[in-house]
From Swiss-Prot:
Organism: Chlorobaculum parvum (strain DSM 263 / NCIMB 8327) (Chlorobium vibrioforme subsp. thiosulfatophilum)
Protein name: Membrane protein insertase YidC
Record-level GO BP terms: protein insertion into membrane; protein transport
Subunit organization: Interacts with the Sec translocase complex via SecD. Specifically interacts with transmembrane segments of nascent integral membrane proteins during membrane integration.
Keywords: Cell inner membrane, Cell membrane, Chaperone, Membrane, Protein transport, Transmembrane, Transmembrane helix, Transport
Gene behind this protein: yidC
Subcellular location(s) per record: Cell inner membrane
Gene3D superfamilies in UniProt: 2.70.98.90
């Protein structure tokens, strides 16, 4: 590998490390209380109450809703092709969501909704008598007599809960499930509530984030956020510091609000125009889990006594094609890096090719190998041109050293003469690193795809159990600086291929330089890839294997005639000027 390639890779590695640490999405930290009309969404109201305050009775805390504070909870289980959900009559909320096709790190089904919470969904509002109402504190009655329901294929099933506040006011919540979909239709019907809600507004709230499912909880915590999409822009909130309280509140029409962990998302998509959104996040000391809230703020039109609001809930995997099919830009919540560089590579090249190949090849390890071969084939002309350029550069080395020695005290003249030699020999000094530079955006994009795409999750290849995480063969139990807390085998094999690739690639370096670089660069890449997804290391390993084969072929077929031609071309162009000088002396 030539010096320019080494420098390019080195700079890219440094940029990548710094970028991962410091170029995370900027978050706003709001430490001041929100206006009183918005405090109904604060879950810590009770925690901030004076210690000496006596507990409120139901009548004091719930006002006209007090009679609904007692009752018997009824759980209704809905089973479809993709998940098993539990609905509770207390709060008419979603209590549990267990996915069938996605397991946790131990290979077992897991509940995406925290069992510590009272449920994920609730309606929050401030009543006209000043009471903060969370419907999860109220007992609804179920309109269904069955405790368990099953729906398959394109069939639909509805489950409804009703709360009769008094003779003139009622609330009805209806969940509609489809047998083969993660989407749940959620209808909220308010009758006689025109004079009940302070400010004529309420919030539909998803509380508690999503339960983590991966072994590396710190990494999953890094991916967990609360988010909203409104005004054509993505609003993110990341509670990364346990000493701060994070919240965001924006007005306007929202396409959706959502909470996510590394591979799963829960999104609420309104049918009617929203008043705005509210996001909140907290993190406790010594715990990786981050607790998130996402809420849609809805306004009941003035003079309207009743309203029916319809929403779509998506609770399931962050599969690009699936979330994109909702046509609300929910795929924007997936982190593919820079929108202007790596995201287009991910969305319009990597994922489409992977999805197409997956129709014919089921093993993602093989898909990665085929993809590496395709990329190497596409870059073949560049590699050939790069090799020829390096051979010419090698032929020019004696002449360049002579000029460098001659004009060492005249930098301007030195650069002028070197430029003349490059031009007359038809050599681009940066041509050797062009293939490397071109594939870097692709490599970055693949890092994001392999790291966050659920397609690779728990898909193995040979000894690798999960291509989306490092293929650790030995865990230390402690962290080494730069290297990490484990030994991954795939990066070691990849570093070996980097070593051999350098050995057979033409270079303009001196022997001393080559000795240093041939060991330093593989070591640097080993450090860099040890904590990367094993799928990415597999791609680069196979790309290097194909590069070695390609380089061996080029070395065998591209003769040294280019070297001689380059030297002769420069010598011929230099001769006339020398002859003119000699002729001048004879005169």
């Amino acid at each position: 590998m030539d010096r320019n390639s080494v420098i390019g890779f080195s700079l890219i590695a440094v940029i990548m490390i710094v970028w991962l640490q410091f170029m995370k999405p900027e978050q706003k930290t709001m430490l001041d209380p929100v206006p009183p009309s918005r405090e109904m969404v604060q879950k810590d109201a009770a925690e901030n109450a004076p210690a000496s305050a006596a507990p409120e009775t139901a009548a004091e805390s719930l006002g006209s809703f007090a009679k609904a504070s007692t009752g018997t909870e009824q759980i209704i289980t809905v089973d479809n092709d993709l998940f098993t959900a539990e609905l509770s009559s207390k709060g008419a909320t979603l209590k549990s969501m267990v996915l069938k096709k996605h397991l946790d790190v131990n290979g077992k089904p897991f509940n995406l909704i925290s069992e510590k919470n009272k449920g994920a969904l609730s309606m929050l509002f401030l009543s006209n008598d000043g009471k903060r109402i969370d419907t999860r504190d109220l007992y609804f009655r179920s309109l269904d007599t069955k405790k368990s329901e099953t729906v398959t294929g394109k069939e639909k099933l509805s489950v409804s809960f009703v709360l009769d506040v008094d003779a003139s006011r009622s609330m009805q919540v209806t969940y509609t499930f489809t047998g083969d979909s993660y989407v749940i239709d959620y209808d909220l019907k308010l009758n006689g509530f025109g004079s009940t809600l302070a400010g004529n507004e309420y919030q539909l709230d998803w509380d508690g984030g999503l339960v983590y499912s991966e072994k590396d909880t710190a990494d999953e915590s890094h991916n967990a956020i609360s988010s909203a999409y409104l005004g054509g822009g993505l609003l993110k909130l990341d509670a990364k510091d346990s000493k701060k309280r994070y919240q965001e509140e924006e007005s306007g029409k929202a396409e959706w609000v959502a909470v996510r962990n590394k591979y799963f998302v829960a999104a609420m998509i309104p049918e009617r125009e929203t008043e705005g959104v509210f996001l909140q996040g907290t993190k406790k000391d010594g715990v990786d889990f981050e607790n998130y809230t996402a809420a849609l703020k809805m306004m009941i039109p003035a003079g309207q006594n009743s309203v029916t609001d319809r929403y779509r809930l998506y609770v399931g995997p962050l599969d690009y094609n699936t979330v994109r099919s909702l046509h609300v830009d929910l795929e924007k919540i997936m982190d593919f890096g820079w929108d202007w560089l790596t995201r287009p590579f991910a969305e319009y090249l990597i994922l489409p090719i992977f999805n197409w190949m997956n129709k014919y090849v089921t093993n993602y390890g093989l898909i990665i190998i085929i993809f590496a071969f395709l990329i190497k084939t596409v870059t073949w002309p560049l590699s050939l041109a790069s090799t020829k350029s390096m051979k010419k550069m090698s032929a020019l080395q004696p002449m360049m050293k002579e000029i460098q020695e001659k004009y060492k005290n005249d930098p301007a003249k030195l650069q002028s003469e070197l430029g003349r030699i490059y031009k007359e020999a038809g050599v681009n000094p940066l041509g050797g690193c062009l293939p490397t530079v071109i594939q870097m955006p692709l490599l970055f994009a693949m890092f994001y795809v392999f790291r966050s795409s659920i397609q690779l999750r728990q898909h193995g290849f040979l000894w690798v159990k999960d291509l989306s995480v490092p293929d650790s063969i030995l865990d230390f139990g402690f962290k080494l600086p730069l290297y990490g807390d484990h030994i991954a085998l795939m990066p070691i094999l990849m570093a070996v291929t980097v070593f051999f690739q350098q050995k057979i690639t033409p270079t303009t370096q001196t022997n001393d330089q080559m000795k240093i670089m041939i060991w330093m660069f593989p070591a640097m890449m080993l450090l860099f890839f040890n904590n990367m997804p094993s799928g990415l290391a597999l791609y680069y390993l196979m790309f290097n294997v194909f590069s070695i084969a390609q380089q061996a072929y080029i070395n065998a077929t591209v003769s040294d005639e280019d070297k001689a031609a380059a030297a002769m071309q420069v010598a011929a162009s230099a001769s006339p000027s020398k002859g003119a000088k000699k002729g001048g002396k004879k005169k």
